[in-house]
């Protein structure tokens, strides 16, 4: 199957912001959202059940490309570390890449950003795609919501420091929106995005610091 015919699956996570939602040592994952052109799915509940359910779902989906927004430095290593704390094996493979430049400090306990694949799915961090050209050319922030508004999309916005205060329905909608935006922004630039898909072997190292 040629790369351009593979489906794109947006992925986004939300973490418990009660203490520090940016530290995987203390903050559990409370929601994971997946988005494809034909569905939006949101996983909630106990963290161990979320991790297993997402992994099982990805294992059964047609091989494609997982699109994240800053997932190389946040979402994917966060999920990997939380799974390790539970003793859960995921089909998520990470490889640290020191060549990926970070604008902000790395995730707590990690050296930087990673290349990834999950089961038979490749990975693209769409944030790095847009930061590489759109950001410098237009001198705009490459935050997900900023880019979405720039191209005419309507993101759902909340106070990210108070994710734990959102209602069940609001959390579902917010997570699904972010996963959908990552997917759509990748699909809209697929001719270029295809070249940004991570290239690592399926049996690469599971890199959790």
Predicted regions and their residues:
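Conserved RNase H-like, two-metal-ion catalytic cores of nucleic-acid enzymes
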Residues: 1-67
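Intrinsically disordered or highly flexible coil/loop and linker segments, enriched in small
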Residues: 63, 67, 136, 156-157, ...
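Generic, well-ordered alpha-helical scaffold segments in large soluble proteins
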Residues: 57, 61, 78, 82, ...
